[in-house]
Amino acid sequence: INFATLSKFFAETLAVAEHILLRPAFPEEELRTYCAKRKQRLTIDRTKVDVEAREAFARALFGPQHPYGTSYDEAEYDRLTRADVVEFHRRRYTAENCFVVCSGRIGERERQAIAALAERIPHGGATVPAAFPAPVTEHEAFVGHPGAVQSSLRIGRLLFPRQHPDFLGMQVVATALGGYFGSRLMRNLREEHGYTYGVVAAMVNFEREGYFAVATQVGTDVTRAALQAIYDEIERLRTEPMPAEELEIVKNMMTGEMMRILDGPFGIADVTIENILCGTDNASIGENIRRIRAMTPADVQRLAQRYLAREELVTAVAGAADPRQA
């Protein structure tokens, strides 16, 4: 739950926070309106190849029975009751399951008021982490969408969460591939071939898992060519050392983005929350910058060779025609 306010309205905002945390009403009519809107939004989203590819990619990575690979349908909103929401709040919104992050102009008076509210959050025992099944990965997935003029592509693989020592290095690899406008995939797919308006590559972090992914949308007629271009760029990172000048640009992009995010109370709060959830603190920011600056072309090639072998990649496509049959 996030609250942002001007300092002069701190007391009024804290009163609203207290009501939401300690005495939520969950009015039946408002709940039904919310569910109807979310159901309609989901119905609309399911008509888009981008959403279909994203869900197919998650199922392929983790398996349909894994929490990270499960997709819910519109009927779930019809089954949700006010009693379900009240019970979820009672079990999950407890002192053992929460922490408070404050940023901005927070004085001693404000800090004490926030601490007093936090102390009033009911105790209920820490939630026992759910048992996750082992991921069951399929390497290819296709979702047919008759009449679609574009195909949505996802290529990647299951790797590791942020706590892994190679996560940051793989962020450098992903940035070089598709993390900024002048990245390799942008130059290849957009500037050289005109297959797409944009392509992105990133490392994605969950609490218990993490993965590497490339995502883009292309014209149906160039689906196979675009897939091959992505495979080729990944393979080029594995077989050819990256020029030092290019790597320096990548490093500057990453460290500059980190500084931009930290420029202000909202970004500082977001980074702090992520660090707490990942079991670290803000002291890791400086260490991460140091590690990024220390990356060499050999490091990039080594990581690409270790983690991005073609046979390990998962490919998901949503569109009018299955590229495997073309």
What are these regions (language model features)?
Residues 1-126, 160-161, 169, 191-326:
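Charge-rich, well-structured scaffold segments of protease-associated domains
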Residues 125-183, 317:
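His/Glu-based metal-binding/catalytic segments typifying zinc-dependent metallopeptidases
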Residues 184-192:
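Short amphipathic alpha-helix segments
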